[in-house]
C-alpha cells in the first residue's frame, strides 16, 4: 500500500478539515494548490487563465482545443469539462493549463509563460482589505510574473483592463468586440443552441461556430482562439473543437426539457453568482429564447459578496419574469446583520419588482408542478448547493 507523501489543499479547505488535521499530525507536508501548480510549471509551458468571470470556461476551451490538436496537455480547471468528465487531466505533452484563482491572491504564486485576463471587477475584496485598487494591483503583479518573452492575452473591451494596460510592462494582445482590439469580434448571432461569430486581425479573418450561448462565451472563446493561434494550432482544428465543444458542468448547462401541457419547459443550471455573471446569463437566454418566459431560482453566495454588491444584485434580479429566492449560502462565512434573503425580497419589491417569492429547498419542486401559460425556462442560479436541488428536481420531473 502506497503511503501519502504530500497533501495539496485549496483555500476552500478549512484548517479543521479532518484529512488536513490527520496529515499535520503525521507530519505529512501540506502544500497550497497554487504552490503545487507553480512547481509543476517549472517543467511545462505554463498557461494561466485569470479574471473575475469566464476563467473556467476559457480554461476548458483552451484544454479542449489543445487536446484536439493532439498536444496532450495537463490541465487543472475550476469546473467539470463534460467531454473529459473531469476538471483535471495529467497529460504527457509540454503544456500545463491552469485556472488561476485571484480570490485568495494565490494566482500570484504562479509563473506562467502565457496568461489570459478575461476581465477585472470588484469581487473577493475581503481578501484585499476591502480595496478594489488592491485587487487591480494584484492583477498587474500577475501579468508581471510573465518572463520577458511571455505574452498576456487580455479582453480589450473590459474597462479596468483598458485602465491598467499602460502599466502591464509585458507584451500583450487584446481581443473583443471593439474595433481598437488586435483581434476584433463581429457578426455575432445565435440559433438558440449555438453561437456564430467572426474573428479578425490585421492579417486574417475566420468564422467560428461555438456550441455555447451568449456573447460573454464568445469573448471567452476569442481568448482561447487567440492563445491557440499564438501557439501555432491550425485554424481548422480550433474551428472543429469549438463547434463540437460539449460544455462545462453548471456553466449555462441545459439539463433538458419536457412538455407541461401544451408548453415546453427548458431547464438550465448555471454557476454564476456575481451580478455581472447573472446579467450575462439573463441576456444570453433572452437573446436565444426571446419567446420564452424566464423564471429563476437564485441562491445568493456568501454574506460578504451579497453585502458588497447588494444594489447590483437588486438591479439584475429584477430582469427575470419571476424570481424564487433561497437562503444565502454561507460558504463558511458568519452571517452579517441585515444581509439575508427576506431583505433582498423587500428591496426588490421597493424597487418595483414584486414577482419574487422566498422558498426553502424543499419548496422549489412545487413550482414545477404547475401549468405554464407559455413556453418557460427555469434557470437555477448560484454557486452553493443549488446544483443538487436542480439535478434532483429535473430527475423527478423529466
Question: What residue spans do the PLM features occupy?
Answer:
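Beta-strand->loop->alpha-helix junctions that form or flank phosphate-binding loops
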Residues: 31-38, 76-79, 170-191, 209-215, ...
Amino acid at each position: 500500500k502506497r503511503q501519502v507523501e504530500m497533501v495539496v489543499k485549496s483555500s476552500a479547505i478549512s484548517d479543521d478539515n479532518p484529512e488536513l488535521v490527520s496529515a499535520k499530525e503525521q507530519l505529512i507536508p501540506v502544500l497550497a494548490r497554487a504552490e503545487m501548480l507553480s512547481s509543476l510549471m517549472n517543467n511545462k509551458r505554463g498557461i494561466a487563465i485569470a479574471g473575475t468571470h469566464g476563467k473556467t470556461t476559457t480554461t476548458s476551451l483552451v484544454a479542449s482545443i489543445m487536446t484536439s490538436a493532439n498536444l496532450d496537455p495537463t490541465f487543472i480547471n475550476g469546473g467539470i469539462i463534460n467531454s473529459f468528465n473531469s476538471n483535471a487531466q495529467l497529460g504527457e505533452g509540454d503544456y500545463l493549463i491552469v485556472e488561476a484563482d485571484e480570490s485568495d491572491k494565490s494566482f500570484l504564486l504562479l509563473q506562467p509563460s502565457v496568461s489570459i485576463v478575461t476581465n477585472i471587477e470588484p469581487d473577493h475584496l475581503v481578501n484585499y482589505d476591502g480595496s478594489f485598487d488592491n485587487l487591480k494591483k494584484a492583477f498587474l503583479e500577475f501579468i508581471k510574473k510573465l518572463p520577458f518573452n511571455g505574452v498576456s492575452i487580455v479582453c480589450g473591451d473590459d474597462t479596468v483592463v483598458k485602465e491598467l494596460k499602460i502599466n502591464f510592462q509585458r507584451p500583450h494582445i487584446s481581443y473583443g468586440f471593439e474595433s481598437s482590439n488586435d483581434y476584433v469580434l463581429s457578426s455575432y448571432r445565435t440559433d438558440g443552441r449555438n453561437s456564430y461569430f467572426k474573428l479578425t486581425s490585421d492579417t486574417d479573418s475566420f468564422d467560428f461556430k461555438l456550441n455555447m450561448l451568449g456573447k460573454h462565451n464568445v469573448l471567452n472563446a476569442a481568448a482561447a482562439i487567440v492563445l491557440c493561434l499564438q501557439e501555432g494550432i491550425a485554424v481548422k482544428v480550433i474551428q472543429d473543437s469549438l463547434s463540437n465543444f460539449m460544455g462545462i458542468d453548471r456553466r449555462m448547462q441545459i439539463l433538458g426539457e419536457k412538455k407541461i401541457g401544451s408548453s415546453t419547459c427548458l431547464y438550465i443550471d448555471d454557476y454564476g453568482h456575481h451580478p455581472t455573471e447573472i446579467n450575462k446569463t439573463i441576456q444570453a437566454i433572452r437573446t436565444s429564447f426571446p419567446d420564452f418566459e424566464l423564471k429563476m431560482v437564485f441562491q445568493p453566495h456568501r454574506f460578504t459578496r451579497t453585502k458588497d454588491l447588494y444594489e447590483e444584485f437588486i438591479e439584475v434580479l429584477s430582469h427575470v419574469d419571476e424570481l424564487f429566492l433561497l437562503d444565502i449560502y454561507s460558504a463558511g462565512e458568519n452571517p452579517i446583520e441585515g444581509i439575508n434573503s427576506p431583505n433582498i425580497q423587500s428591496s426588490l419589491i421597493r424597487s418595483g419588482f414584486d414577482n419574487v417569492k422566498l422558498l426553502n429547498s424543499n419548496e422549489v419542486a412545487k413550482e414545477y408542478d404547475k401549468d405554464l401559460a407559455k413556453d418557460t425556462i427555469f434557470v437555477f442560479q448560484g454557486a452553493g448547493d443549488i446544483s443538487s436541488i436542480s439535478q434532483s428536481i429535473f430527475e423527478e420531473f423529466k
